[in-house]
């Protein structure tokens, strides 16, 4: 719900916070369209009606409301979209990002079907740190650097096949009641460790930033936005 943004999210979801003169979600949509994406599904919760308004200008957008958004987390939101997504392979994006088109193109060009995008550790934010083996298979991730052999940090953009997502949802159903607040990152890790490998694509030099609060917003406007226009 973007509580760290204070008044910025009193009336709109976090993705509608503007960087420069445009909301983050609109920037993401424009990048996706420029890369040839023709269908966009948005999992909604807080202030869902704001996302509904988007569909008037972007007819390729579909929404899927999660009535449990306040008591669950990102994995439940993803799980909740399963009927809307249907049999499609898809890209999974978080709403609080700014990124250059290279992020999307790198995933689309990657030969692997189930892919986590990361970059080398360069920022000073709180991040999900990622570890992978010699085959680039995801082996660990954590917000604590000391827990992993850090190879990079999670961007928050992924490519998933329908076959993988279907297995992911079935695996999550088993633990849903015990872990309603599970983030999708940790379900990806569960899958990669025991069900189906997730390939980690490490892209040096990629310009992106996760925007969680006002200080992130100021940093991104000064140092990242010029590369993402």
List PLM regions with ranges.
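N-terminal nucleotide-binding beta1-loop-alpha1 segment
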Residues: 1-10
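Short catalytic helix/loop segments, enriched in acidic residues and glycine
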Residues: 11-27
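Conserved beta-strand segments of alpha/beta enzyme cores
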Residues: 15, 60-62, 137, 197-199
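A structural signal for short hydrophobic beta-strand segments in well-ordered beta-sheet cores
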Residues: 16, 130-132, 200
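Conserved N-terminal catalytic core of the sugar/cofactor nucleotidyltransferase
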Residues: 22-90, 178
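Short beta-strand-to-loop acidic/aromatic patch adjacent to the donor-nucleotide binding site
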Residues: 88-98
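Conserved core of the sugar-phosphate nucleotidyltransferase
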Residues: 100-175
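Conserved alpha/beta core of the MobA/IspD/sugar-nucleotide pyrophosphorylase nucleotidyltransferase superfamily
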Residues: 153-229
